[in-house]
Amino acid sequence: VLEHVGLNPTRTGVLAILRAMGADIAVTNERDVGGEPVGDLRVRAAPLRGIRIPEDQVPLAIDEFPALFVAAACAEGETVLTGAEELRVKESDRIQVMADGLATLGVAAQPTPDGIVIRGGPPGGGRIASHGDHRIAMSFAIAALRAGGPIDIDDCANVDTSFPGFAALAAGSGLDIRVEG
């Protein structure tokens, strides 16, 4: 159970997309804290399937797409994202950087001008360039949970700035993670 998760409706696209992919996610204990909706998430293992992500969900999950790309890599079949050209002008070109990283791990990922096509397959290991993008670094750390080999991620110093304690939380979730340098 993940406790006290923000559930602002302008930010919950990630839940809708994961559920459409087959994820078993239930929201419990919904409440308002400081005027914002929060709740607890119960997540159970479930096979994911590739989908065409509805464009109306893009603005509701724009910052979560690197993690969703990892979910797509672990899904059965093809996931198609369109209408997400904004991802090209974030801290990095998240479409290209994620496509390159997934390819390094042996996952078929074809970038398009406004999105990406990912064919699910088990990720392997490799060295990933995060390009200093905290969301890229954290997403590939998550990928290590399913990878067939170790994943080394370069240029991760800003992760602790945006998500203090990420490495400790990830380790507590079963990830074999080491921060070097």
At which residue positions do the language-model features occur?
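Short, structured segments at the rim of ligand-binding sites
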Residues: 1-181
